[in-house]
Amino acid sequence: VGAALALGYPVLLPDGDGANNIYAINRVASHVILDSMRMVHEQHDFPLAKSHFVSLGASHGGMMTGYTAAEQPYYAPDLTAYVNQFVVNEGAPDLIKLAHSFGLYGELQNAPSVYGSFLMSFVVGAAREYPDLLPHLYQWFTPYGKAVVKGNRSICTPLTFAVGPGVPIKNIVKEGFFASQTFKNMLQIAKYSSSFYYPG
């Protein structure tokens, strides 16, 4: 950001997580990014109506940017002539494969995972954006899981650190969660949010 500003380029910083933390809900985040670009063209305070864009994201920003690249031709075809490039750094395109590799579920779900906190952040965002698919989600949390979510659910970084490293996933959700319809719906939401499964 600093380098771009030093070179005289305007910088747009859309909040893809939103005020209430929708971590890794990338379809929604992609609309935030694309609508922000449209806003740049439509506002009248600065002479930017014909501005072109380079969209850059790393880590979670990379996931959002990758999904935005897939979604843009369908959701915002009016921006095609103005988006020069999407640059993705460390943006996982497949959240389900990522969860497997991190041991968030599957064979390693009983082992301590330093990434359990990221699962919680995703779960909170999914519950907020897809309540129709997850009507019974919170009944699957253990007392520990409920306490962590209640105290930190509206702020991404504290939620990430609140669970902390070395906490087995079984301490967060009750036995049977991974065989439940709620979990199956969660996998579907993960597909919705993964550019690897993008239907376009």
Model-derived features: positions:
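Short beta-to-alpha linker loops that shape the active-site pocket of alpha/beta-hydrolase fold enzymes
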Residues: P10, D15-A19
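Alpha/beta-hydrolase active-site loop
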Residues: A6, Y23-P47
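Short amphipathic alpha-helix adjacent to the substrate-entry channel of hydrolases
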Residues: V1-V11
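Extracytoplasmic/secreted proteins, especially bacterial periplasmic and envelope-associated proteins
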Residues: A3, V28, V32-D35, M64-Y67, ...
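Accessory cap/linker subdomain of secreted extracellular hydrolases
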Residues: N89-Y198
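Short, proline-enriched alpha-helix->beta-strand connector loops that line the catalytic pocket
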Residues: Y82, Y197-G200
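Primarily recognizes the serine-hydrolase "nucleophile elbow" in alpha/beta-hydrolase
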Residues: R38-N110
